[in-house]
Every structure is written in structure tokens, then in C-alpha cells.
Amino acid sequence: GIHGIPVTMQQSVYDALAGGALSNYWTFGRDSRDASYYNRVVVGALRAVDFICSLPQYNGKALGVTGSSQGGALSVITAALDSRVTFLAAVHPALCDHEAFFKKRACGWPHYFYYYGAPDEKQLETVRYYDTANFARLLNVPGWFSWGYNDEVCPPTSMYAAYNVISSPKELHPYLETGHYWYQEQWDEWLDWIRRQLNVPM
């Protein structure tokens, strides 16, 4: 996970962290792009690419990133920042179009300004630096995207704000009635596309 914590502990450990030390972690360090919690998270994603590229199993050709929600955002960000990534697949990506709030539109998770009030200039600069839509402009690899129109966590308008600025090859597969979850056929379609990018037999 993004917190650098083993994923094999008892659920009670994660529940305690979510309600305690990691509560509202997305607000940590939001006065500075360098102190932001997401700085370490993004660097960690790039280090993961370093690790994959160091493995003898890696063919040096195809390397994809994929995820949903926060993981979808990190997929876009990682693909935008690291030229070794050759494709991405993002499902209901978060962290999109933070400033939509000021234009009376729905912004994506974590809805900074709904819950935490109007930002000062430093906070505004920081959230711009970690806005998926701003990284989407930098993409130059194929991307597969999917989301639902009933998603209240990552509203579709926020995700369209990122999708619409992508100039590289892209596919959007909306599942209109879904919220912040997947249908099985959506999962199957996502996996088939990834297999094609990797030239893996279906």
C-alpha cells in the first residue's frame, strides 16, 4: 500500500491507523508540494518502476501501470512521469480537478475544499501539483479508462476533466450505472486490454 505498511497484518491494525495516525492522511503537509504526503507516495510509485526494471524477468519492452481510485490517479501520474511505462489502465481515478469546487462543479476525491475550507495560496499551489488532470496532459502512452456515472466518490465530471486533456491514444469504457465499484464484465474488459498490451495469450 501507499503507506509503507505491510499488508499482512490483522484488520484491526489498519482500522486503528485509519482512525488515528493516518486519519485524513491526504491533508498531511498540504502547505507544501515537497512536504505533502503525496510526495512520498509518488516517489514510491516511481521507485516501484525502478524495482520492476531491475528484475531479470522484465523484458525491457512492455511495462504497464494500473489501479482504481487513488491507484488510478497514481497510474496516470506514474505513466506521465516515467518514460519506461508503456501503457496505463485507470478505473475511476481520484485526485482529479480539485479546483472544480470553485466553479461550482464536482471535484474528485478527496474533495479538499468541501471539507477543509477555502485554501490559502500555498495550499492551492500544492493541490494543483497533485491533480491528476495536470499529469494527464503529459501522457504519451496508450491508456484505458473506465468509470460510472453514479460515482459520488470520484464524480464523472472530475474524471472527464483529466480524460479530455489527454492527447495520446486513449479508450474510455463507461459503465453508466455503476458507482465507485466494478462490474465483473468491466474487470474482464480491463484485464483483456492489459493482456493485449503485454502480448499475453487470451
Regions found by a protein language model. Name each.
Residues G1-V43, A100-C107:
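Cap/lid segment of the alpha/beta-hydrolase catalytic domain
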Residues N24-S69:
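Gly/Ser-rich "nucleophile elbow"/oxyanion-hole loop immediately N-terminal to the catalytic nucleophile
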Residues Y149-C154, H180-Y181:
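Acidic catalytic loop of the alpha/beta-hydrolase fold
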